[in-house]
């Protein structure tokens, strides 16, 4: 049996989507009739038909979120700290900002200004040493990119963790160079001992700093996604300017060390991050806003006030069974609009001229309906979740929160 609170939550979500004319296209007229049927079943027996209707509406909501099916994340799925921190910055959680800045996270203003979706991909564990490179300091590693067809990638970044070098007589004044390449042909087709690559990005860094380094790999990812060229992976090369062979490549983390726990390594693995847009809504933009109201937030009763206004509606993703794949937020305050639009319409009811005329006509001819209480302003929320392929996604969803109501 499906819990009654889950069914009721789906009903409430559907009511929000059906609450205003701007959302009428999200659910067809036949769907509106089904809402009434579900409401009739919610307080009584749960028939097989009600379960079918629940599945239909869950599918509708998943489609609204741009998902073909409900994600079923594996227990081994890892949420990179970078994606959590990016979500906190995007959602404007100010109390976390100092901590985020402390680990050296830089918000990617330029990529995000053209994207409404951020995806992250860990590299496959198998690494190939590239023969013929100086001191065997170059490795090839692969990323399995699963990106929807409607997603247009604008920018891609490779993040590698670099540890401080504290060995050798010259470490305080030493530097090393990190080069990132795209592998143009598979090793089987290359001349023995020489891999065909092209340089994507390079950086000269000091030995005595521990931090993440970010490299622009957009040309390679755009070739793989837009031009549908084969993906033969990336190569990383580390060369030291003032250090012996003994210390070559020991501090740029591309593989797990033997004494290291799997949990620590999961957060230090190389991470490929793509910034894209699916043509829906607006781009991700960094902003600060007040935190959404908590789930149980008492409101003062407004006696004798039945006019159109905004009411509390907290959507808890655990109530609809989605908390296993939605990482953050655990829920959000969606609000809804409800109330009368009496004649004459007061200024605070945020009415249009047409609504004023319609209400005036209704006062003398009851066959003409009153103006309706509907959302007049809506805002977006950011969601961090695991998709159907266990990839971590940060996405901006438009028109999810009612900011204002009015008679229209």
From Swiss-Prot:
Q: Which SMART domains match?
A: TGFB
Q: Which PANTHER family match?
A: BONE MORPHOGENETIC PROTEIN 4 (PTHR11848:SF165), TGF-BETA FAMILY (PTHR11848)
Q: Where on this protein are sugars attached? A: 144, 208, 350, 365
Q: Point out the signal peptide segment.
A: 1-19
List, in alphabetical order, the Gene Ontology terms for molecular function in this entry.
BMP receptor binding; chemoattractant activity; cytokine activity; growth factor activity
Q: Which UniProt keywords apply?
A: Chondrogenesis, Cleavage on pair of basic residues, Cytokine, Developmental protein, Differentiation, Disulfide bond, Extracellular matrix, Glycoprotein, Growth factor, Osteogenesis, Phosphoprotein, Secreted, Signal
Compartmental location: Secreted, Extracellular space, Extracellular matrix
Keyword NADP in the entry? The reply is no
Q: Give coiled-coil spans as residue ranges.
A: none
Report residue numbers covered by any propeptide: 20-292
State what protein this is by name. Bone morphogenetic protein 4
Output the Gene Ontology cellular-component terms.
extracellular space
Mark the residues carrying the PTM Phosphoserine: 91
Please tell me where this protein is predominantly located. secreted
The text of the family note is:
Belongs to the TGF-beta family.
Protein purpose: Growth factor of the TGF-beta superfamily that plays essential roles in many developmental processes, including neurogenesis, vascular development, angiogenesis and osteogenesis. Acts in concert with PTHLH/PTHRP to stimulate ductal outgrowth during embryonic mammary development and to inhibit hair follicle induction. Initiates the canonical BMP signaling cascade by associating with type I receptor BMPR1A and type II receptor BMPR2. Once all three components are bound together in a complex at the cell surface, BMPR2 phosphorylates and activates BMPR1A.
């Amino acid at each position: 049996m499906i819990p009654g609170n889950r069914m009721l939550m789906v009903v409430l979500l559907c009511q929000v989507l059906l609450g205003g004319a701007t959302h009428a296209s999200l659910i067809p007229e036949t769907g509106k009739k089904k809402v009434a049927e579900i409401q009739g079943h919610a307080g009584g027996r749960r028939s097989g038909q009600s379960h079918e209707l629940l599945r239909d509406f869950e599918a509708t909501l998943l489609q609204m979120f741009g998902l073909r099916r409900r994600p079923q994340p594996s227990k081994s799925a890892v949420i990179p700290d970078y994606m959590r921190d990016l979500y906190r910055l995007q959602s404007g959680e100010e109390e976390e900002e100092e901590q985020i800045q402390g680990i050296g996270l830089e918000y990617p203003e330029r990529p995000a200004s053209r994207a409404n979706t951020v995806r992250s991909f860990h590299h496959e564990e198998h690494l190939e040493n590239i023969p013929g490179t100086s001191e065997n300091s170059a490795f090839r590693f692969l990323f399995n990119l699963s990106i929807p067809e409607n997603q247009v990638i604008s920018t891609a970044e490779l993040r590698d963790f670099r540890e401080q070098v504290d060995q050798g007589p010259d470490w305080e004044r030493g530097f090393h160079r990190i080069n990132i390449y795209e592998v143009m042909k598979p090793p089987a087709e290359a001349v023995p001992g020489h891999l065909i690559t092209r340089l994507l990005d390079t950086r000269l860094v000091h030995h005595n700093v521990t931090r993440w380094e970010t490299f622009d790999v957009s040309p390679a990812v755009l070739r793989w996604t837009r031009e549908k060229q084969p993906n033969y992976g990336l190569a990383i090369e580390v060369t030291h300017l003032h250090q012996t062979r003994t210390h070559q490549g020991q501090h740029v983390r591309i593989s797990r060390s033997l004494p290291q726990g799997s949990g620590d390594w999961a957060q230090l693995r190389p991470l490929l991050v793509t910034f894209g847009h699916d043509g829906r809504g607006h781009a991700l933009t960094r902003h600060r806003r007040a935190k959404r109201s908590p789930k149980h937030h008492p409101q003062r009763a407004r006696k004798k006030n039945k006019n159109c206004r905004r009411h509390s509606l907290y959507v808890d993703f655990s109530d609809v069974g989605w908390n296993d794949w939605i990482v953050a937020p655990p829920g959000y305050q969606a609000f809804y609009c409800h109330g009368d639009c009496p004649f004459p319409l007061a200024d605070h009811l945020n009415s249009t001229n047409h609504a004023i005329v319609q209400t005036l006509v209704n006062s003398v001819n009851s066959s003409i309906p009153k103006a309706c209480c509907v959302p007049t302003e809506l805002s977006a929320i950011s969601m961090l979740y695991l998709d159907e392929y266990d990839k971590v996604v940060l996405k901006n969803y438009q028109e999810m929160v009612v900011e204002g109501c009015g008679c229209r």
